[in-house]
From Swiss-Prot:
Cellular-component GO terms for this entry: host cell endoplasmic reticulum membrane; membrane
Name listed for the protein in its UniProt record: Membrane protein UL20
Coiled-coil region(s): none
Topological domains, Cytoplasmic: 245-338
This protein's record includes keyword Membrane: yes
Domain of life of the organism encoding this protein: Viruses
Glycosylated residues (UniProt): 27, 54, 57, 68, 73, 79, 84, 108, 119, 143, 171, 178
Keyword check for Transmembrane: yes
Subcellular location: Host endoplasmic reticulum membrane
Chain ranges on the Lumenal side, renumbered to this chain: 26-223
Keyword vocabulary terms for this entry: Glycoprotein, Host endoplasmic reticulum, Host membrane, Membrane, Transmembrane, Transmembrane helix
Membrane topology: Single-pass type I membrane protein
Length: 338
């Protein structure tokens, strides 16, 4: 697992470098959008990006609501985050909820909002939060050394993304930060080549991809643990069964039917066995018969001799032919003349 994480970190770094080399700087204005995304397990993602200044003509089509900015001085804070908002006014649940704010940082009188991630009846802190985001954006654009970099910050329970210093249209912004499915807007296409490996824009589609990947990785790891545990239990059970059979049945894996373990030799019998001589062994029954299965083998039915065959009838008995008689003694007769 450590090797996989190290590889992902390297890919994240490569992806960020790839993104930073593909963009060009646009003429930025003080008009920005700020997004707030909440989801399951306390996930909070915020994003800040530039916006074309002609967005006022499109607020009606998307249902944005205009609200007057309350008099708030944000200069006391240098690093505003969702902790500056009223926590009870942030809507959190088991599903993803988004809110998009639009404002002109040069006009501290009005802002527009769309979405349900924040309860806008809590107007005490929202104005200061948005003015703090304006301050962060100006600092990001003015002090950035490379205009083709992405800044991702982890602030405790919040992930904040400072987008490339470009200007995005309202259509693309709403589609990327409010829709979980659909085609990727062309303006955000540079960010999505390897989005499962890095949080670059804190968008809704990106959050779905990341969280689904993490969920699948978790299920895969749990499945591996379950399979490993099951295999281990099976192996331990088989090992115990083999050991029981080994010690219970005299080193046999399967006990014969009807077999009873004979008692082991006593110390006295062991001593007597040591005193046996060669002549005694020739006469004795095989040594250590109690440890062998000789008694069981001899008494088993498979070793009983079959009954003898009946005698053959006399007429079928064939006797071998008798040998020819030996010739009689031969006598020599000698005739003498008279």
């Amino acid at each position: 697992m450590l090797g996989i994480r190290a590889m992902l970190v390297m890919l994240d770094y490569y992806w960020i470098q790839l993104i930073t080399n593909n963009g060009t700087r646009s003429n930025n204005t003080d008009t920005i959008f700020v997004s707030l995304l909440t989801g399951p397990n306390g996930v909070t993602r915020t994003a800040i990006g530039g916006l074309y200044s002609n967005y006022t003509n499109l607020t009606g089509a998307f249902g944005f609501t205009s609200t007057n900015m309350s008099a708030t001085n944000s200069s006391a804070e240098d690093n505003w985050s969702v902790t500056n908002l009223t926590e009870s006014c942030i809507n959190r649940g088991e599903s993803y909820v988004t809110t998009i704010w639009l404002l002109d940082c040069t006009k501290n009188d009005t802002y527009w909002y769309y979405g349900n991630a924040y309860n806008h009846t809590c107007e005490g802190t929202i104005s200061g939060y948005l003015l703090g985001m304006c301050k962060l954006w100006k600092s990001w654009v003015n002090n950035i050394t490379s205009y083709n970099t992405v800044r991702v910050e982890s602030l405790g329970n919040e992930t904040r993304c400072m987008l490339l210093p470009r200007q995005y249209t309202l259509n693309a912004t709403v589609e990327w930060y409010n829709k979980s499915e659909g085609d990727v807007p062309e303006e955000f296409m540079d960010y999505v080549i390897l989005t499962p490996l890095a949080v670059l824009t804190c968008g809704l589609q990106e959050a779905y991809i990341l969280d689904k990947g993490r969920r699948y990785m978790y299920l895969f790891s749990v499945s591996c643990v379950g399979i490993t545990g099951t295999v281990s239990i099976i192996l331990v059970s088989l090992s115990l069964l083999i050991l029981i059979c080994y010690y219970r049945c005299g080193r046999l894996l399967i006990c014969p039917r009807g077999f009873e373990l004979l008692p082991e030799f006593t110390e006295e019998e062991e001593e007597k066995e040591k005193l046996l001589t060669h002549n005694d062994i020739e006469v004795q029954v095989p040594i250590r018969t109690r440890r062998l299965l000789v008694p069981w083998i001899r008494e088993s039915k498979m070793w009983v001799l079959p009954p003898p065959l009946p005698p053959r009838p006399p007429h079928l008995i064939e006797f071998p032919p008798s040998p020819p008689p030996s010739p009689g003694p031969m006598h020599m007769v000698v005739c003498m003349p008279a």
